[in-house]
Design a protein with these regions (language model features):
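C-terminal catalytic/motor cores of large multi-domain enzyme assemblies
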Residues: 1-196
Length: 196
């Protein structure tokens, strides 16, 4: 009888590092999970208004309109930055014998690449407007997928957002990216009848 048929795939240094760090995180950091639904109607309406205004301001330039278009994730990044400013303990990192509270909201965003997951950082999100967050998010995600991020563009960060909503995922649990203390896992929005 023939044995199982398979192919062993080599592991890149990046994947090896990701696996090591996340395994250590899960084994050494206390994880607890809070799940809740939020109403997105106003965010989606505001996004639609902003994107319509941006398209009109582009005067028929499709590329300019596309570059200015905001995603739902851009609003989530800005909301997280505001929340981190209001709750400094969530904007902190564990360093063994001390906890470092950050004064800026440097938000890492999880980006899937052919070599694994990487978390480029939008620095000082609390001081940025939605347009800047949207522009930087697109630029960093493209650089990540192209393998062109510089170390300072993905090392550090005070908080991570992992959004799988665009893939239709309704719920998942994310692993904290050490030494950060928190990660926000975002699922898909859905139409739902909500009683008054």
């Amino acid at each position: 009888a023939a044995g199982p048929s398979y192919t062993d795939q080599p592991i890149s240094n990046m994947r090896r590092t990701i696996a090591k760090r996340l395994t250590e995180s899960k084994a050494t950091l206390p994880h607890y999970y809070v799940t809740f639904d939020i109403e997105m109607d106003r965010v989606l309406q505001l996004r639609e208004l902003f994107n319509r205004a941006s398209a009109e301001a582009a005067n028929g330039n499709a590329e300019k309109a596309k570059d200015a278009k905001l995603s739902v994730n851009d609003f989530i990044v800005k909301a997280a930055a505001i929340a981190l400013r209001q709750v400094p303990a969530a904007n902190s990192a564990w360093h063994g014998d001390f906890i470092r509270e950050y004064h800026t909201q440097d938000i890492s965003m999880a980006v899937a690449t052919p070599n694994g997951l990487i978390t480029p950082i939008i620095r000082n999100c609390g001081a940025l407007g939605l347009s800047d967050i949207g522009r930087m998010s697109k630029e960093l995600a493209k650089k990540a997928r192209d393998g062109k991020l510089k170390p300072e563009e993905y090392q550090g960060g005070s908080f991570t957002i992992s959004n799988m909503g665009m893939m239709g995922t309704s719920h998942f649990t994310a692993i904290i990216n050490p030494p950060q203390s928190c990660i926000l896992a975002i699922g898909a929005s859905e139409s739902r009848l909500v009683p008054d």
